Amino acid sequence: MPNFEISLLYPNREASEKNAQGLDNPKISMETLEALELDYAIELQNSRLCDMFTMDKEVIEYRQEVFKDLLENEELCTLLNKLCPILSDISDLRRLSSESDATDSYLYCITEIELYITAIELLNDGLTPMKDNLKSSALVNLYEHVSELTKSEYYADLNIRLKELTKRVREVRSVTIGVNLDSRLRPESAGVLSVNNESFKSGELLQKILRLDFKSDEYTCIASLQPFKKGQSDNQQYVLNNAFNNALNDVFKSSMRSWKKVVSAYVLENADFLIKLSPEIEFVTKATELIKNLKQAENPLVFPEITSFEDKVFDVKGIYNPIVAMKTGSKMIENDFAFDKNGMFYVLTGPNRGGKSVITCAVGHVFALAQLGLPVPASYAKISAVDGIFTHFPTSAEDTIDKGRLGEECARLDEIFEDVTENSLVLLDESLSSTGSYEASYIASEILSGLSIVGCRGIFSTHLHELGMMIDDINEKTKFQGGERIDTLVAGIFEGERSFIISRQKPDGKSYARDIASKYGISLDKIIEKVKKNK
């Protein structure tokens, strides 16, 4: 059968090669994934999550169809989860085979093809009952290829040959060795007389002579069997092992070597696609687990409509933070969020723990999950992909030895401008919190002016309420250089309580303080009243 290529993530070879060459990969670093906690949400062992992202609309839509099949067919997820450890075992065997001696290598080769056949039969038996329910071209093609493979004469012949050789090898229980002695009864040379399918048993010379039933028993020894390694040094064990394996190699080498060639040819032509699929299968199964966990809390999920890259659309209804939802297992407060001509970048202010960081991350989550091909945490979403997600979040590991904390923050912010484009997303959370509000507001206004001129989308979540008051001046300054408009958002508070509702309005820092002070009795009228009572 001809070599077959299939992918659960890419619709054709060209798209796969573009991804491998980094031509359609958005710049999303592992640091960004850690900041958004997506490495926690989708934990991969055999690949890197940052390599799974794409900017290609066709690729995203191709993946969406795969995930729809996975979500609509529970048994499909179960099937792929069963397949994962088998493929992992094959990879481990390949590694061990390359590190082992000839005998072990041949045995690993037999086990490898057994695992391949197990995997293919598992797929065929699992996909056949659900074939009429599959809609994605990836999974339909996978079923058709596996079905064709299992029906081929070559596959049937391979099974027969495997069973014959497996029986030969796996039924070996003992080896009869002939040893020549010198005049002083010291071993001089040795060779294998026979390979047996029965084990030797301990016995005694007298029993062998007197008992008729032992006389014709070739597998009862005339002395007790001794453990192979008893009384031997490590060096002696190695020498004996090596000699024994060399003898076995001579017995099996002709059939084993010819078999290994058959196995290699079969694997390369028909089964190696499973190993190539292994990281993709791990990714889609782990990602589907995330989606199922979010569904259990009855939070909305929707496959986004993907628009042209150049449209720079982001219109989302009912957005929420999926990481918080997964950790709490509760129904989340939802918000509506959009980037538009009046606000491609936002300054988000509000009370501490009022939801600023939560919504900032949520916007990053929607872009990231969309560009993995997954449904996003929202009830409606229309999105243009980004060519990178850049974050600057608080960290407890600032390298402040050379620059000081403010210097380090500025250095990290400056790095963003090395790669950011008009099609990027920038998320800044409490940046410049290491200095006073006057200095921080000045530096922040310079950064916002630069990001406006770049034309990227993003959010600056900050405690600097006065920064929101500077937005009109920043927009006025950058409009003559073609800058995109910046707008303001406010994390809501009602009667001193955080509402977690994000509103598009100008900030009023005093209102937060006034509401909270009133709640805890820290107003001038109440203070005077308490002072009078104490007199």
Regions found by a protein language model. Name each.
Residues E171-N241:
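Structured, charged N-terminal subsegments at the starts of enzyme catalytic cores
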Residues Y108, E269, F273-K276, R405-E408:
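Alpha-helical initiation/capping and key positions within long helical/coiled-coil segments
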Residues M1-R186:
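Conserved amphipathic alpha-helical "coupling/scaffold" segments
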Residues N124-K135, T166, R173, L185, ...:
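Long, hydrophobic, amphipathic alpha-helical segments used as structural scaffolds
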Residues K229-A265, A271:
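Extended, charged coiled-coil "arm/hinge" scaffolds of SMC/Rad50-like chromosome-maintenance ATPases
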Residues K215-K230, N245, F345-I359:
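A short, charged
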Residues K276-V324:
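Charged, amphipathic alpha-helical linker segments immediately N-terminal to NTP-binding catalytic cores
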Residues F309-K535:
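ATPase nucleotide-binding head domains, primarily ABC-like/P-loop NTPase cores
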